[in-house]
Amino acid sequence: HFSDTWAHPGQQILPSEWESLNFDELKEELYSHISQIMTEIEPEYIQIGNEINTGILFPHGDIVNNPNQFLELINHGVSAVRSLSSTTKIILHFAGYEASQWFYNLVDEVDYDVIGISYYPKWHGKSLEELEGQLSNLSENFGKEILIAETAYPFTLGWNDWTNNIVGLDEHLILPDYPATPEGQRNFIRDLKTVVLGDSRGVG
């Protein structure tokens, strides 16, 4: 996430230990951090940031105000991965598919392997058919592998603890196909998997 809290399109907050760094120092710290992860975990896949629609490590990597610095940070992270592994696949992760074509055009010259998409019906549309078309377009236009990096679907709308349900209403669901039941949850995941793996570049 490159943050002390959740990173998503609405917030990409610098880790507190990096707040005093200038841009060049931040790049080096990012490189060192990713290198440490690569050495300790040896991952098969790695994301450079989480849901980076609007950038990373604000304000330095804000796409709107600092697009060139955003690309520098991403490329620096990619270099750290490539320096330690020729097999680890690099994911660039976008939330939803609205504006995804624009984003992946922006990063077209970045050396990455996989387009990662978040898909939550509540926020990103309630049609698996539309999702299928969007994933196909991304695959064809950019020639990258495709995966669903984040998703979730409830098996109940019941309030069974003291934590608020993010998805808690019928209007958040894909009905009548996928009710909030164990079977509805299972069928949603099954059909989503079918959509992704139905693409020649779909990996999961």
Protein language model annotation of sequence segments:
Residues 2, 6-14, 157-169:
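Short, flexible, mixed-charge acidic loops at enzyme active sites
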Residues 6-110, 124-133:
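Active-site cleft segment of glycoside hydrolase catalytic domains centered on the general acid/base Glu
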Residues 110-114, 127-164:
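Aromatic-lined glycan-binding groove of carbohydrate-active enzymes
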Residues 44-47, 87-91, 112-116, 145-148, ...:
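Structural preference for beta-strand elements that scaffold enzyme active sites
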Residues 54, 121, 153:
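Short, glycine/acidic-enriched loop or turn micro-motifs at the edges of active sites
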Residues 1, 48-50, 92-96, 117-119, ...:
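A cross-domain feature marking catalytic cores of carbohydrate-active enzymes
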Residues 145-158, 167-204:
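Substrate-binding cleft of secreted/luminal carbohydrate-active enzymes
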Residues 84-86, 142, 199:
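Helix C-cap/helix->beta junction micro-motif
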